[in-house]
Protein backbone atom coordinates (compact mmCIF):
# COMPACT_ATOMS: atom_id res chain seq x y z
CA UNK A 1 0.00 0.00 0.00
CA UNK A 2 1.21 3.49 -0.84
CA UNK A 3 0.78 6.29 1.71
CA UNK A 4 1.25 10.06 1.74
CA UNK A 5 2.95 11.03 4.99
CA UNK A 6 5.45 13.33 6.66
CA UNK A 7 9.17 12.59 6.67
CA UNK A 8 11.11 14.50 9.34
CA UNK A 9 14.17 16.52 8.55
CA UNK A 10 15.88 19.52 10.09
CA UNK A 11 18.01 19.49 13.21
CA UNK A 12 17.36 19.14 16.93
CA UNK A 13 14.57 21.46 18.06
CA UNK A 14 14.19 22.80 14.48
CA UNK A 15 11.81 20.37 12.77
CA UNK A 16 11.15 20.42 9.03
CA UNK A 17 8.91 17.90 7.30
CA UNK A 18 8.78 16.74 3.70
CA UNK A 19 5.42 15.49 2.44
CA UNK A 20 6.29 12.27 0.66
CA UNK A 21 4.65 9.36 -1.11
CA UNK A 22 6.10 6.10 0.19
CA UNK A 23 5.40 2.41 0.62
CA UNK A 24 3.71 1.83 3.97
CA UNK A 25 6.33 -0.76 4.99
CA UNK A 26 9.25 1.68 4.72
CA UNK A 27 10.39 3.54 7.84
CA UNK A 28 9.31 7.14 8.39
CA UNK A 29 12.48 8.83 7.14
CA UNK A 30 13.49 6.07 4.72
CA UNK A 31 13.16 5.61 0.98
CA UNK A 32 10.25 7.38 -0.69
CA UNK A 33 8.72 7.36 -4.16
CA UNK A 34 8.15 11.09 -4.61
CA UNK A 35 8.35 14.31 -2.59
CA UNK A 36 5.18 16.33 -3.18
CA UNK A 37 5.64 19.18 -0.73
CA UNK A 38 6.94 20.38 2.61
CA UNK A 39 5.75 21.66 5.99
CA UNK A 40 7.76 24.00 8.19
CA UNK A 41 6.00 24.24 11.59
CA UNK A 42 8.30 27.02 12.83
CA UNK A 43 8.10 29.32 9.79
CA UNK A 44 8.10 32.99 10.73
CA UNK A 45 7.05 36.15 8.96
CA UNK A 46 7.42 35.94 5.21
CA UNK A 47 8.73 32.37 5.18
CA UNK A 48 6.59 29.80 3.42
CA UNK A 49 5.30 27.28 5.95
CA UNK A 50 3.45 24.84 3.71
CA UNK A 51 3.63 23.88 0.05
CA UNK A 52 1.84 20.98 -1.63
CA UNK A 53 1.98 20.29 -5.38
CA UNK A 54 -1.75 19.93 -6.08
CA UNK A 55 -1.56 17.99 -9.36
CA UNK A 56 0.77 15.35 -7.88
CA UNK A 57 -1.44 15.06 -4.78
CA UNK A 58 -4.47 14.50 -7.01
CA UNK A 59 -2.54 11.93 -9.06
CA UNK A 60 -1.47 9.86 -6.05
CA UNK A 61 -4.89 9.98 -4.39
CA UNK A 62 -6.34 8.95 -7.75
CA UNK A 63 -4.17 5.84 -7.96
CA UNK A 64 -5.14 4.80 -4.43
CA UNK A 65 -2.59 6.34 -2.06
CA UNK A 66 -3.89 6.89 1.48
CA UNK A 67 -3.01 10.18 3.20
CA UNK A 68 -2.12 10.12 6.89
CA UNK A 69 -4.42 12.03 9.27
CA UNK A 70 -1.77 14.72 9.77
CA UNK A 71 -1.32 15.18 6.02
CA UNK A 72 -5.10 15.43 5.57
CA UNK A 73 -5.14 18.19 8.22
CA UNK A 74 -2.32 20.03 6.43
CA UNK A 75 -4.09 19.71 3.07
CA UNK A 76 -7.18 21.37 4.54
CA UNK A 77 -5.05 24.00 6.26
CA UNK A 78 -3.29 24.83 3.00
CA UNK A 79 -6.55 25.22 1.12
CA UNK A 80 -5.89 22.34 -1.27
CA UNK A 81 -8.73 20.02 -2.21
CA UNK A 82 -8.66 16.25 -2.08
CA UNK A 83 -10.51 14.56 -4.92
CA UNK A 84 -11.97 11.13 -4.21
CA UNK A 85 -10.39 8.29 -6.25
CA UNK A 86 -13.74 7.44 -7.89
CA UNK A 87 -14.09 11.00 -9.19
CA UNK A 88 -10.61 10.90 -10.73
CA UNK A 89 -11.23 7.52 -12.38
CA UNK A 90 -14.50 8.73 -13.92
CA UNK A 91 -12.88 11.84 -15.43
UniProtKB/Swiss-Prot annotation:
Top-level division of the source organism's lineage: Bacteria
Keyword Ribonucleoprotein tagged: yes
Short name of any one Pfam family annotated for the protein: Ribosomal_S16
Keyword Nucleotide-binding included in the entry's annotation: no
GO CC field: cytoplasm; small ribosomal subunit
Similarity remark: Belongs to the bacterial ribosomal protein bS16 family.
Example GO BP: translation
High-level lineage: Bacteria, Pseudomonadati, Pseudomonadota, Betaproteobacteria, Burkholderiales
Keywords per UniProt: Ribonucleoprotein, Ribosomal protein
The protein's name in its UniProt record: Small ribosomal subunit protein bS16
Residue ranges of the TM segments: none
NCBIfam families according to UniProt: S16
Gene Ontology MF: a single term: structural constituent of ribosome
Gene: rpsP
Amino acid sequence: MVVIRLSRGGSKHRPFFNIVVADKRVRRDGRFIERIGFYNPIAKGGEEGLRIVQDRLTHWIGVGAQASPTVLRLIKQGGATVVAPAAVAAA
